[in-house]
């Protein structure tokens, strides 16, 4: 047994015999046949021949061995009773209070001291102290009639008109009452009657304050709900200009695609017009193809003229122009076309100037000099057309793809043709690039104007060399050797036969090579069984 230490040693009786604990239930034999024996027999039915192995070490519940320092010490009952008695005496001694002599005790003073912690500032002065402290003023000795009003919020001004009027009137009355209360506190004119009235008002106004708080909370919730509903509207309003710009750009793109479609379809007509110069100048006027072409040309000129009138400015009160007819001479047709061009040139220049100013950047750095900085688009176009040494104008008179007849004859320059192959190739290249980008991204394909069937090369998708049958790419990949390059199978181009080759190698160095054919014949004559028995004859 471990020796007692510390305080336990003081209560230890050296003469006390160590008694052994006795458990009355320890010697009771557990009956195998008791209540529930029938159930146990049913459970063990068919398994009587099994060997009982008992519980495993993992299933045995063993207590934790905390060590000898956690074991208790034996204490006698007398020592335990003495300790409890001493503790009760200490509690009784601490609970005793010192009382004064009842004959000399001042009960009123003792009651005042007992209630000193609960006295309020309003009842601090008694009736006997009024004369002594009548000239003194105690500030903030009473509670205000109503709490200070909260700071105004945006929700306070979002209520209905009736509530606004009531709230404004109530705030004025509250301000007046606050001013009166402050004046009374400063001057010291408030009396106990006013304070009692204020206390009564406070009790009566408690419900009103709760109602006001509920109203303010509901107003705040309404304002929050309105603010949340206004957020998507504000976001939609802020993004609306961007949406309008996007729609306008889409419409411009459609118009540009339509004009490019017209230019592509007019390519054959331009080639035919440039080919007229190379044909016979005196065709048969009575031929049927000539008349059909003339009617088609007059119809096309009328269509172009009507389009110019529709897009041009309206001229009210003017006489309706005469349509072109086959019976008109070439000079009359040319004069009418010149008149239409003069009427449309002013409107066309105004529109070009307007849109050039809109699309022009603010920080454009023009050429040096004031004239170059102030040059407009119209003046620049006129200079390009009037200048005879202009490179673009000269290039338009060189026959290429748009004038195949002159190009076949080797003509270097012809003033009667118009060939814009350079500009046309640039337009086609931009169209192919645009269709390629739209096809790869998958956007805008439905909005594009159908022009011509173009086979644009799509970007080849580089896919990784992944074995789909492997388990998450964990299949081992290896290369045995490099692929053979520039490999060709050998081809026998020799003129000698195999027998001649053997004879040549056999007669080299002046002697005949023995092929040991005789020895092979002798070996063939030996019996296989006889050769196998030689091992046992030795």
From Swiss-Prot:
Keyword list, A-Z: Coiled coil, Nucleus
InterPro entries: AATF, AATF/Bfr2, AATF_C
Family of this protein: Belongs to the AATF family.
Comp. bias regions, Basic and acidic residues: 7-23
Compartments reported by the entry: Nucleus, Nucleolus
Region listing for Disordered, in residue ranges: 1-239
Source taxonomy: Eukaryota, Fungi, Dikarya, Ascomycota, Pezizomycotina
Matches recorded under Pfam families: AATF-Che1, TRAUB
Species for this entry: Gibberella zeae (strain ATCC MYA-4620 / CBS 123657 / FGSC 9075 / NRRL 31084 / PH-1)
Keyword Nucleus tagged: yes
Coiled coil: 290-363
Compositional bias segments (type: Acidic residues): 80-105, 172-222
GO cellular component assignments: nucleolus
Chief localisation class: nucleus
Any one of the GO BP annotations: maturation of SSU-rRNA from tricistronic rRNA transcript (SSU-rRNA, 5.8S rRNA, LSU-rRNA)
Record bears the keyword Chaperone: no
The protein's name: Protein BFR2
């Amino acid at each position: 047994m471990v020796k007692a230490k510390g305080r336990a040693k003081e209560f230890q009786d050296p003469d006390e015999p160590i008694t052994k604990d006795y458990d009355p239930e320890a010697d009771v034999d557990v009956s195998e046949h008791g209540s529930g024996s029938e159930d146990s027999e049913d459970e063990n039915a068919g398994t009587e021949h099994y060997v009982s192995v008992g519980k495993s070490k993992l299933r045995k519940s063993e207590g934790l061995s905390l060590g000898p320092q956690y074991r208790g010490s034996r204490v006698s009952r007398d020592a335990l009773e003495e300790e409890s008695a001493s503790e009760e005496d200490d509690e009784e001694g601490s609970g005793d209070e010192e009382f004064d002599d009842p004959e000399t005790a001042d009960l009123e003073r003792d009651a005042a001291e007992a209630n000193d912690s609960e006295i309020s500032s309003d009842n601090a002065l008694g009736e006997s102290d009024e004369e002594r402290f009548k000239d003194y003023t105690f500030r903030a000795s009473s509670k205000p009639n109503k709490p200070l009003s909260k700071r105004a919020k945006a929700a306070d001004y979002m209520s209905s008109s009736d509530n606004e009027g009531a709230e404004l009137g109530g705030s004025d009355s509250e301000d007046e009452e606050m001013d009166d209360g402050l004046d009374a506190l400063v001057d010291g004119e408030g009396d106990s009657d006013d304070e009692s009235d204020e206390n009564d008002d406070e009790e009566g106004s408690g419900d009103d304050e709760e109602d006001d708080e509920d109203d303010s909370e509901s107003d705040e919730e309404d304002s929050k709900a309105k603010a949340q509903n206004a957020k998507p509207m504000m976001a939609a309003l802020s993004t609306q200009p961007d949406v309008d710009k996007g729609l306008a750009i889409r419409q411009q793109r459609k118009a540009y695609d339509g004009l490019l479609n017209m230019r592509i379809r007019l390519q054959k007509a331009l080639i035919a017009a440039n080919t007229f110069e190379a044909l016979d100048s005196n065709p048969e006027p009575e031929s049927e193809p000539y008349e059909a072409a003339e009617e088609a040309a007059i119809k096309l000129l009328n269509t172009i003229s009507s389009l110019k009138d529709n897009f041009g400015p309206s001229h009210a009160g003017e006489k309706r122009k005469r349509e072109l007819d086959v019976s008109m001479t070439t000079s009359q047709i040319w004069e009418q076309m010149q008149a239409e061009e003069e009427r449309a040139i002013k409107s066309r220049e105004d529109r070009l100037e307007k849109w050039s100013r809109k699309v022009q950047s603010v920080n454009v750095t023009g050429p040096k000099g004031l004239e170059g900085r102030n040059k407009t688009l119209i003046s620049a176009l006129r200079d390009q057309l009037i200048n005879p040494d202009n490179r673009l104008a000269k290039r338009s008179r060189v026959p290429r793809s748009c004038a195949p007849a002159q190009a076949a004859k080797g003509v270097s320059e012809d003033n009667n043709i118009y060939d814009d192959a350079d500009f046309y190739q640039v337009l086609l290249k931009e169209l192919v690039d645009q269709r390629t980008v739209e096809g790869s991204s998958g956007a805008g394909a439905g909005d594009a104007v159908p022009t011509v069937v173009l086979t644009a090369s799509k970007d080849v998708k580089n896919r990784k060399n992944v074995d789909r049958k492997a388990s998450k790419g964990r299949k081992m990949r290896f290369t045995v050797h490099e692929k053979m390059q520039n490999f060709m199978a050998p081809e026998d181009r020799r003129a000698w036969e195999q027998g001649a080759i053997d004879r040549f190698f056999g007669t080299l160095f002046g002697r005949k090579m023995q092929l040991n054919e005789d020895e092979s014949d002798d070996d063939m004559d030996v019996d296989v069984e006889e050769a196998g028995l030689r091992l046992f004859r030795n």
